[in-house]
Swiss-Prot record:
<keyword id="KW-0812">Transmembrane</keyword>
<dbReference type="Pfam" id="PF13980">
    <property type="entry name" value="UPF0370"/>
</dbReference>
<feature type="compositionally biased region" description="Acidic residues">
    <location>
        <begin position="51"/>
        <end position="61"/>
    </location>
</feature>
<keyword id="KW-1133">Transmembrane helix</keyword>
<protein>
    <recommendedName>
        <fullName>UPF0370 protein SG1720</fullName>
    </recommendedName>
</protein>
<comment type="similarity">
    <text>Belongs to the UPF0370 family.</text>
</comment>
<keyword id="KW-0472">Membrane</keyword>
<keyword id="KW-1003">Cell membrane</keyword>
<feature type="transmembrane region" description="Helical">
    <location>
        <begin position="3"/>
        <end position="23"/>
    </location>
</feature>
<feature type="region of interest" description="Disordered">
    <location>
        <begin position="37"/>
        <end position="61"/>
    </location>
</feature>
<feature type="compositionally biased region" description="Basic and acidic residues">
    <location>
        <begin position="37"/>
        <end position="47"/>
    </location>
</feature>
<dbReference type="InterPro" id="IPR020910">
    <property type="entry name" value="UPF0370"/>
</dbReference>
<dbReference type="GO" id="GO:0005886">
    <property type="term" value="C:plasma membrane"/>
</dbReference>
Length: 61
């Protein structure tokens, strides 16, 4: 870990570059265009349907 004490500034520069690159990439995203042209979701199957019929709660008088 001695190299980290000597080269902490390099690690900081790499992290700052990643942060700046991420912000730039997110600014290029056009959410309204995506929402207008988004693909339809395929129908999903309810995997809990077979357990929904079981009633584990006690009956109320």
């Amino acid at each position: 870990m001695g190299w980290l004490a000597d080269y902490w500034w390099v690690v900081l520069l790499v992290l700052a570059g990643m942060l700046i690159g991420g912000v730039k990439a997110l600014r290029r995203v056009d959410a309204t265009s995506y929402l207008k042209n988004r693909p339809e979701l395929p129908p999903h199957r309810d995997n809990n349907a077979q357990w929904d019929e079981e009633d584990d709660w006690p009956k109320k008088p």
